Amino acid sequence: MEKLTILLLVAAILMSTQALNQEQRQQAKINLLSKKKPSAERWRRGCTWWFGRCAEDGECCSNSCDQTYCELYAFPSRAI
C-alpha cells in the first residue's frame, strides 16, 4: 500500500511539472506572436494622421514625413 501511495505521489509531481513546462512554452509562443504591433496599435498610441504636421518619419502613422506633413503612403525617394 505504501508503494502505491509513493508511486501516485511521484506520478502527480511529474504530471504537474509537465503541465507547468507546457504552459511556459505556450506563453513564449504568445509573446513571440505579439512582438510586432499592428498599425492600428500605433494609431491608438498617438501618431499623427495623414496630412498632419510632423518633423520626422516616426511621428506619422504611415511612418512617412515629407518635411512638414505626414504622407498617406511612404513613397520611394526621388533623386533630383
Curated annotation (Swiss-Prot):
The uppermost taxa in this organism's lineage are: Eukaryota, Metazoa, Spiralia, Lophotrochozoa, Mollusca
Q: What is the recorded function of this protein according to its Swiss-Prot or TrEMBL entry? A: Gamma-conotoxins may act on voltage-gated non-specific cation pacemaker channels (HCN).
Gene source species? Conus amadis
Query: Which superkingdom is the protein from?
Result: Eukaryota
Entry's free-text remark on domains = The cysteine framework is VI/VII (C-C-CC-C-C).
Which named protein is this? Gamma-conotoxin-like Am6.6
Q: Which cysteines are joined by disulfide bonds?
A: 47-61, 54-65, 60-70
Q: Where in the cell is it found?
A: Secreted
Alphabetic keyword roster: Cleavage on pair of basic residues, Disulfide bond, Gamma-carboxyglutamic acid, Hydroxylation, Ion channel impairing toxin, Knottin, Secreted, Signal, Toxin
* InterPro entries to which the protein is assigned, alphabetical: Conotoxin (IPR004214)
- Modification 4-hydroxyproline, positions: 76
